[in-house]
UniProtKB/Swiss-Prot annotation:
Its EC number is 7.1.2.2. It is an enzyme of class 7 (translocase). It comes from Asarum canadense (Wild ginger). PANTHER family: ATP SYNTHASE, ATP SYNTHASE SUBUNIT BETA, MITOCHONDRIAL. This is ATP synthase subunit beta, chloroplastic. GO terms for cellular component: chloroplast thylakoid membrane; mitochondrion; proton-transporting ATP synthase complex. Its main location: plastid. GO terms for biological process: proton motive force-driven mitochondrial ATP synthesis. It catalyses: ATP + H2O + 4 H(+)(in) = ADP + phosphate + 5 H(+)(out). F-type ATPases have 2 components, CF(1) - the catalytic core - and CF(0) - the membrane proton channel. CF(1) has five subunits: alpha(3), beta(3), gamma(1), delta(1), epsilon(1). CF(0) has four main subunits: a(1), b(1), b'(1) and c(9-12).
Amino acid sequence: MRINPTTSVPGVSTLEEKNLGRIAQIIGPVLDVAFPPGKMPNIYNALVVKGRDTVGQQINVTCEVQQLLGNNRVRTVAMSATDGLMRGMEVIDTGAPLSVPVGGATLGRIFNVLGEPVDNLGPVDTRTTSPIHRSAPAFIQLDTRLSIFETGIKVVDLLAPYRRGGKIGLFGGAGVGKTVLIMELINNIAKAHGGVSVFGGVGERTREGNDLYMEMKESGVINEQNLAESKVALVYGQXXEPPGARMRVGLTALTMAEYFRDVXEQDVLLFIDNIFRFVQAGSEVSALLGRMPSAVGYQPTLSTEMGSLQERITSTKEGSITSIQAVYVPADDLTDPAPATTFAHLDATTVLSRGLAXKGIYPAVDPLDSTSTMLQPRIVGEEHYETAQRVKQTSQRYKELQDIIAILGLDELSEEDRLTVARARKIERFLSQPFFVAEVFTGSPGKYVGLAETIRGFQLILSGELDGLPEQAFYLVGNIDEATAKAINLDEESKLKK
């Protein structure tokens, strides 16, 4: 149920209907509010400050109760800027946690942390809302079967398969294709699984959020003509927002995803970009609340906060939430408490490599650095496991030989090593793939490759059956049959040129 502070029952004044307090202290985004004795709000309740500033501008700030201080005071964190607030202003206790709209009405729209649309496309149907604070599903509700979540992207499905209802860390710097990979996953999930996606932009650049929205409209992931046909809901709490909003925007996105899982019984993809910013915002709030900092200045409740978010991302008997989280690693230090705490929750890691992106191999997923707990013979089967291991071994050997090739050239290698290098280069190119969402930029149609087709293709390369085909035939194709067809076309083109 939602208690909306903007509406009141006819004939009853707001004062009689609501629990009223007054601002006692303001320290940046942290407000202390005094309430009458016996009228204290609960932890996590949403409070609304309404009034006018000194210039007469309307103020409407929502806060969340974090601590009960005693002496009838509560300490709260604001979800928007506190400019213009003054001591003594009235604060209304809504009597419930923050609630946000959920369901089909959210598709194709952009929301802020409070669940308010920020895309200038009119109001959203708020008849179905859900509180952002919920407990994780009980043990008895969980679906613990190990099953692979097929993405249709060759390199991911073969070498670092995603678990249905699992959590995946997406590691990559700027400009290596994180956004395009995220959009392709959203597109493929919608087509292959009939599922929807929720994107939570946590503390990232506003420009990037805008770019993502524009690219989604261009590629058809968001359908402007008919929003209900869209495959994604977007929730943004960008870098410019106060720490309270950045700390809670992940929960807003998760709440929308939970509705699609529990009520609509779908397989949902939840993207969080960037999970490090969630921790960073929690650290800022923790210091402002006066808690003693822990290691490296992080909040003492780091593991608890991370756990309360991550434990809600899971498979139940109804459906699943599979989460892909971009992870920023501060100063490339993997032992920093923020990434170290995140690693404990991940089932797979997809590492994007600048070296591969520079070669034009997209998706630029590093086949050797990317890992998955699902890549075990008892889960994926002996054939898949063996093929993946041989692909990795061949790629690793090629990597070891690169220094020798750079100094002495290919001719100095043994016959066996030359064969390994030739196959590794074919594998490297065959791991690239044309994306549906990149069609508008590249002009080449996207390809969804099933897991069985992927395994068959790499087995043919490893067995040596395709040693006679040129390398470029394997670049940016779908399955292996397309590579052989491309080789024939290349051969015919070269004959025509002669």
